[in-house]
Amino acid sequence: MNDNNERKPLRTIKGLVISNKMQKTVTVLVERQIKHALYGKYIKRSTKLHAHDADDLCNEGDVVLMTEVAPISKTKNWRVVEIVARSD
């Protein structure tokens, strides 16, 4: 057990909002680059995550910063912390 009450830093991810049709929920596309094991070429991989947007402030095309939280529903484990860039 850890005697001091230090918490692990929260995991944060930046992504692009691709849908805001649900109430208090946005779908965020998170892209990352991985290196191919054999050829060494960098490949783009993407993941779609659902995030909690309590005030319904996000619009499609916004870039948001999310943090991991305890499960809010079956598919929501992320919460929108801030809107980094607004869509034009």
Swiss-Prot record:
GO terms for molecular function: rRNA binding; structural constituent of ribosome. InterPro entries: NA-bd_OB-fold, Ribosomal_uS17, Ribosomal_uS17_bact/chlr. Pfam families: Ribosomal_S17. Keywords: Ribonucleoprotein, Ribosomal protein, RNA-binding, rRNA-binding. CDD domains: Ribosomal_uS17. GO terms for cellular component: cytosolic small ribosomal subunit. Disulfide bonds: none annotated. One of its GO terms (biological process) is translation. The keyword RNA-binding applies. Part of the 30S ribosomal subunit. Belongs to the universal ribosomal protein uS17 family. One of the primary rRNA binding proteins, it binds specifically to the 5'-end of 16S ribosomal RNA. NCBIfam families: PRK05610.1, uS17_bact. This is Small ribosomal subunit protein uS17. It comes from Xylella fastidiosa (strain M23). The gene is rpsQ.
